[in-house]
Amino acid sequence: MFITKKHIPRRTFLRGTGVALALPLLEGMIPALTAQAQTAAAPVKRFVGIWHPHGVAPGYWSPVDEGKDFEFSFITKPLEPFRDRTVLISGLDSTAAFSTTEEPGGNHARGAVFLSGIRPRRDAVSPYLGVTIDQLIAQKYGQDTLLSSIQLGIEDASHNSGNCNWGYSCAYTNSISWLNPTTPLPTEVNPRIAFERMFGDGLSAEERRAGRLQSASILDSVTHEIPRFKKNLGSGDQARLDDYLTNVREIERRIRTATNNAAAEVSAEVPFGIPESKDIHFKIMYDLMILAFQADI
């Protein structure tokens, strides 16, 4: 016999003006004494692909030993607390990305192979690749999340036409995610816009902008909802929610600071809203990615 209690739907949002704030997984979302694997709160299948255009040093990633007792390298050391849930695979080759004697160049177009496994067509006018694995996964699991997929980047990749390298279309250089063989998906490089895509509730850009002018923080828009929601939570869930909301506010603060700094330090290369510092830009985008997973966006 199962003892059940009224539980919180997994897709619960805190709502305010122009804001729909997703919540992290809480114990209150799991029916009492119900096997977690049988509930909507069961561990979900999610995917992230991270492309390093200039590659990495394999020796710093691949462990020396095989089997469950391998030793983490210094660069993978942060994963050690999750050893029982981590699999490191090495020794793989993507032959479609190899250069040939007939075509020694075009290395910048090789990023298109990363998630597709397909050698890009050497055509600057009509690029053709294939559906990438992230989009195949999005087709199967994307209906369970607020966004089926989101593409984040660091450098402006809005130009997907023309010849970028050895006769290859710029689309191969600028997009690693393809919806279909002829549609590369653009990356979002502005952390503020990425943040608003995650937490806006579908209103127009103008309405979201007006909401920002009325409220200093996205969280300010849902402040009145938080106490009402928390009173039905246990102490563990209250602490978990507080930690999550703190992370949201901190990332928002850093985005605002970086935006203000970028506006103050006028640059011909960096558009408004994008941090001047590459290090800060990288860190914010990675933290946005973590937040998206935490809230299952």
What are the residue ranges of the model-derived segments?
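Ligand-binding pockets and gating/stacking loops
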Residues: 1-297
